[in-house]
Amino acid sequence: MVNKMSREIILHAGLHKTGTTSIQQTLYDDFNNRILEKLDILYPKNWPANHSYPVYSAFCDKPEEYRGNILFSSGLSKEKIDEMNKTNLKNLEEEVQRRRCSKIVISGEDISFLKKKNLNIKLPQQILHIRTFV
């Protein structure tokens, strides 16, 4: 069953060396994350605190050339990386459905390297609106 609830994504494409890691760790912290959820804000917990890896890998033009995949998934074929990306997005979609917050915060430094065209595709159906803050 697809939830038709409209959700807003707040995309924090923090640049490298600007304190983004501190923001991510604060939002990811269990205590703070529960407070955010009570405020109807989801900071996904099924991904690492820094969302760079799952987001950039899923949305870039050539995930097999992404440094994160080269460092952390060395030896995986393009097909396996694509499968991993689909799993990461499915896990996000399931968490969004389960936690039912109307706002979703995604934060990752590598997101700032994505082209705008890459962010306009592959989004789960129930996510309808994106606001980007840099």
Regions found by a protein language model. Name each.
Residues 32, 36-37, 103, 111-112, ...:
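PAPS-dependent sulfotransferase catalytic domain
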Residues 1-90, 95-104, 108-109:
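PAPS-dependent sulfotransferase catalytic core
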